[in-house]
Amino acid sequence: MARYRHSRSRSRSRYRRRRRRRSRYRSRRRRXRRRRRSRRGRRRRGYSRRRYSRRRRRRY
């Protein structure tokens, strides 16, 4: 049983790593895109840069 448990935990960690890499790549693509569009909108609404960065850090 010990052997089975070990192999199971290993597969889990591998799955997590793959998932993280994919999400990071996707977010980079979107940022990009979003930055070009939202730069003007942000200034109009008066968003602070510090606040936005804090939200981002919490998410990822």
UniProtKB/Swiss-Prot annotation:
Gene Ontology terms describing biological process: chromosome condensation; sperm DNA condensation
Chief place of localization: nucleus
Key words of the record: Chromosome, Developmental protein, Differentiation, DNA condensation, DNA-binding, Nucleosome core, Nucleus, Spermatogenesis
GO molecular function: DNA binding
Protein's UniProt keywords contain DNA-binding: yes
Coiled coil stretches, renumbered: none
Tissue specificity statement from the Swiss-Prot or TrEMBL entry: Testis.
Function: Protamines substitute for histones in the chromatin of sperm during the haploid phase of spermatogenesis. They compact sperm DNA into a highly condensed, stable and inactive complex.
Protein name, per record: Sperm protamine P1
Lineage: Eukaryota, Metazoa, Chordata, Craniata, Vertebrata
Originating gene: PRM1
